[in-house]
């Protein structure tokens, strides 16, 4: 069983069930991918497969990556992803990976990079409560105290402060598959997934 597949986010829409209830869904163009490497217990001390997605010109990749892909007779692929597996039986290098093993009703975990929001303050980034807006107060959206005095004499690591918001890897678990179109490589899952349209996603099956 293929543990996962790579794809791109096409956008969100809604579908209606038998009772007429509107369900928000995300449409994903998943695959086809190429199996570029098989790792075994004997050669790598663990079992995994590496798949590639999104064919590009050879001039877009560096020579080490092109050499790695040519070992598996794979074309120039922009994105590579590794998945751990319990067994590599029945899998072959250069094998084409599609949505054949994905079934309606099962759940998947979808990983991707969230939309970057740029530099943000603590109110927007961490939902800090703002200060009084009137009665002479000048502390409206300030972070407030960031620590103690001469003891410990430093700001503790991990303190919530202003900084970049978004643009980080995120995973949404237990998203139900509501539709699979193997002919057009379309996967429809219930709910939202990280990122904007065109974002690269990793779709991993819950039960491997």
Curated annotation (Swiss-Prot):
The keyword Chloroplast applies. Keywords: Chloroplast, Plastid, Ribonucleoprotein, Ribosomal protein, RNA-binding, rRNA-binding. Residues 129-165 are annotated as: Disordered. It is found in: Plastid, Chloroplast. The keyword ATP-binding does not apply. One of its GO terms (biological process) is translation. One of its GO terms (molecular function) is rRNA binding. It holds the Pfam family Ribosomal_L3. Gene3D superfamilies: 3.30.160.810, Translation factors (2.40.30.10). GO terms for cellular component: chloroplast; cytosolic large ribosomal subunit. One of the primary rRNA binding proteins, it binds directly near the 3'-end of the 23S rRNA, where it nucleates assembly of the 50S subunit. Belongs to the universal ribosomal protein uL3 family. HAMAP family: Ribosomal_uL3_B. Part of the 50S ribosomal subunit. This is Large ribosomal subunit protein uL3c. It comes from Rhodomonas salina.
């Amino acid at each position: 069983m293929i543990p996962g597949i790579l794809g791109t986010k096409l956008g969100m829409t809604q579908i209606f069930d038998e009772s007429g209830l509107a369900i928000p869904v995300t449409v994903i163009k998943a695959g086809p991918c190429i199996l570029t490497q098989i790792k075994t217990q004997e050669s790598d001390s663990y079992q995994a497969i590496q798949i590639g997605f999104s064919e590009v010109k050879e001039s877009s990749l560096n020579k080490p990556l092109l050499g790695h892909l040519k070992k598996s007779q794979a074309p120039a692929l922009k994105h590579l992803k590794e998945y751990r597996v319990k067994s590599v039986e029945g899998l072959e290098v250069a094998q084409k990976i599609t949505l054949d093993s994905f079934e309606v009703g099962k759940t998947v975990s979808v990983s991707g990079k969230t939309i970057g929001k740029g530099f943000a303050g603590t109110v927007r980034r961490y939902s800090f409560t703002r200060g009084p807006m009137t009665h002479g107060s000048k502390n409206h959206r300030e972070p407030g105290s960031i620590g103690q005095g001469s003891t410990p004499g430093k700001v503790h690591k991990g303190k919530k402060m202003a900084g970049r918001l978004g643009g980080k890897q995120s995973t949404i678990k237990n998203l139900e598959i509501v539709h699979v179109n193997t002919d057009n490589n379309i996967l429809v899952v219930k709910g939202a997934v990280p990122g904007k349209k065109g974002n690269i996603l990793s779709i991993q099956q819950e039960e491997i």
